[in-house]
Amino acid sequence: MSAQPISDFYAYPDAAGHFGKFGGRFVAETLIGPLQELSAAYDQARQDPSFIAEYDKDLKHYVGRPSPIYHAERLSREVGGAQILLKREDLNHTGAHKINNTIGQALLASRMGKTRIIAETGAGQHGVASATVAARLGLECLVYMGATDIERQKINVYRMKLLGATVIPVTSGSATLKDALNEAMRDWVTNVRDTFYIIGTVAGPDPYPRMVRDFNAIVGRESRAQMLEDYGRLPDAISACVGGGSNAIGLFHAFLNDPGVKIYGAEAAGDGIATGRHAASIAAGRPGVLHGNRTYVICDDDGQITETHSISAGLDYPGVGPEHAFLSDSGRAVYQGITDDEAMAAFHLLAHTEGILAALESSHAVAQSIKLARELPKDALVLCNLSGRGDKDVHTIAAREGLAL
């Protein structure tokens, strides 16, 4: 916890990209120049009304925003306690929040004259969203994906290929998201002249954590306005799943200076934090440097990154965005572990009560929201970010339950 209370969370990051003691730019000398170029281009674009207008137009007419807030009445009755509201990011084009960010970064890539984009992906949703905007803008697209994740996300792999992207399997390390990000960074160093790296989460060196946050902040801005319009007040609590944490920071950001809104992040506790088979970086990690920024990481006593586990490919990452680390240390947000079993139970309960198949990532937030609702009075409002749809996870769920499709 910070010794001094934070009076304005919007004062972060500072000019060097730091969120308190987290964030920054810890990279090889060869990347300093490209990152400075990217930072300058982004700072210029975000002040350009024509760029903002083009981005907003795409969000409305291509993505289909605004996404609605849905009152899950049957789920709320089944659970007892507070009313559970769902921010329906699963209804966006491509089926998740990821396209909010890829559209913004792809427009920036075109503005910078880049002709090739690369991306990393875990669950495949960021890869699909990157391939989608690349197709729309006529850009070459390569997506790095861990071989383990390719096996458990075959549908999204094929979707990327249908959209014209090349999917590069990564077999190093644990062959998951961390390793895909490593390979994408190596590609960018080699091909920086014509290549734009669209990072999919609020990690990486500055300016990525703030840039990805800003492009996803539409989720929170919409939610805040919708809550005031539909309910006449802000929610009592908000919840989102956290791997790197892009969907979560997108929701959280609009509420950071509202002390009456409690903020909760759901990390992947896997088989249980005590087992060591999890991906709960804040709950069980320690400060360290990963992928160019200082944050909480899952590592051994020598500081070496250790393997993680989650049923959800998109949460299977040994770090977390530096702003989340900062929010945790400041006490503004609380991060809790949700196990595979809890996420699976929430997936089924939401399907049976509301007819909605949530992504396994999002199901962690649904599980957390259910726990919160049970502790709150009936007139309390819990807003859960349903960050993606679960079509991509049907085979994983069936296999876990011993069914062959």
UniProtKB/Swiss-Prot annotation:
| UniProt-listed Enzyme Commission number(s) | 4.2.1.20
- Write down the superkingdom of origin: Bacteria
Query: Where in the sequence is N6-(pyridoxal phosphate)lysine found?
Result: K98
Give the UniProt entry's GO cellular component terms: cytoplasm
Cofactor(s) the record lists:
pyridoxal 5'-phosphate
Catalytic activity as recorded in UniProt: (1S,2R)-1-C-(indol-3-yl)glycerol 3-phosphate + L-serine = D-glyceraldehyde 3-phosphate + L-tryptophan + H2O
Q: Which UniProt keywords apply?
A: Amino-acid biosynthesis, Aromatic amino acid biosynthesis, Lyase, Pyridoxal phosphate, Tryptophan biosynthesis
Q: Does the keyword Transcription regulation apply?
A: no
Metabolic or biological pathway, per its Swiss-Prot or TrEMBL entry: Amino-acid biosynthesis; L-tryptophan biosynthesis; L-tryptophan from chorismate: step 5/5
Pfam families according to UniProt: PALP
Can you provide one Gene Ontology molecular function annotated for this UniProt record? Answer: tryptophan synthase activity
Q: What does this protein do?
A: The beta subunit is responsible for the synthesis of L-tryptophan from indole and L-serine.
- Report quaternary structure and partners: Tetramer of two alpha and two beta chains.
Q: Which HAMAP family match?
A: Trp_synth_beta
- Family in the record: Belongs to the TrpB family.
Q: Identify this protein by name.
A: Tryptophan synthase beta chain
- Tell me which species this is from: Xanthomonas oryzae pv. oryzae (strain MAFF 311018)
Lineage, uppermost ranks: Bacteria, Pseudomonadati, Pseudomonadota, Gammaproteobacteria, Lysobacterales
